[in-house]
Amino acid sequence: MDQIKIAVIGLGYVGLPLARLFSTKYKTVGFDMSQPRVDALMAGHDATFEVSDELLQDAIQNHGFICTTKLEDIKDCNFYVVAVPTPVDVNNRPDLKPLWGASETVGKVISRGDIVVYESTVYPGVTEEECLPVVEKVSGLKFNVDFFAGYSPERINPGDKEHTVEKIKKVTSGSTLEVADIVDGVYNSILVNGTHKAPSIKVAEASKIIENSQRDVNIAFMNELAKIFNAMGIDTNDVIEAASSKWNFIKLKPGLVGGHCISVDPYYLIQKAQVYGVLPRIMSAARRLNDGMGDYVANQVIKLMNKKGVLVKDAKILLLGITFKENCPDIRNTKIVDIYSTLSEYTENIAVYDPWANAAKVNHEYGIALTDCSLEELRGQFGAVVLGVAHDAFKKEDIRSFLKNENGVIYDVKGMLDREVIDGRL
């Protein structure tokens, strides 16, 4: 390919940072189905805060980066990158509709000699078995004859300002040896820490899904330990610190597993494994355990309130944070909602405060109304406070000041506070 022109399809948490970075080296167009999203980006603001206004405006003004909803704007591109979500349905089965839709989009614009690279997290085989046949059907072109493909799994960590996209080492792959070299070269040209070229697309797909599945299993183990030690009256954090004194101990903390990656991706591999007659018992058990942690936390809070003589049905409870992780507006699959749901079985007096979350989106997605009170207005009102998300904004607060009296309960989900000021934690 003499002159590469890139189109990134999907401008969310993954696609936008990647497209912005590509634009510093190549002519780049960002494509998204949402006109409001495109309008906001072209006005120089990213509501996900993954790309700063300064960097986004620089890309638009100085590097010719544009965002669009129009197919004609990406027809003259020759290197298509698909970065759309891969969710699960209500039964935790892989939902490939976003990928099929993006593949149809590619099929409408791809030309002979072009390359399409998928970044979405999938089970091994999705790119070649599910996506490329759609591109072939819509375009009328033949895969690996008229057009070619690659896979380079995304490794974006929402809200992480240290491990940004340009600093993350990327796995790459291609449908032929020559295409693999081209794909690897394109990514290598924008990354500080380079790439790892996998021998096949399926290997690259598998590498990403086990990254997230491994973390899910490891956290599930820590959550199980937390349940055991809490029942025994032993502080889990103390145990972890002691065990960490050994050089090869993997230091992880218990916690809620939400978001669009770790809590979703294992289901893709679990389903595909069953097609081959393999039942992934460890991954399945990890998913069940982690999915139940919100309910567990809520019940721990109720027990502590009863123990301290706080009448649950009459008390007010404050949930600090609702996003799935700290310092990030992403509310997808947040497990704080599970805490809220279980607590609401005991009392209707629950206030939820989060300086990062969009109140309208929270209400639309979960039917939960965020309080519009300031932190100052919330002080001295509650029988229990659950610190659910470790936003920096909460670290400087006197959390006990939100309690109505000394009998109130502080539960620290994230292990952020000193033990002297809390009544319980994972």
Where would I find each of the regions flagged by the language model?
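Structural/interface elements that position substrates and couple domains in central-metabolism enzymes
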Residues: 1-426
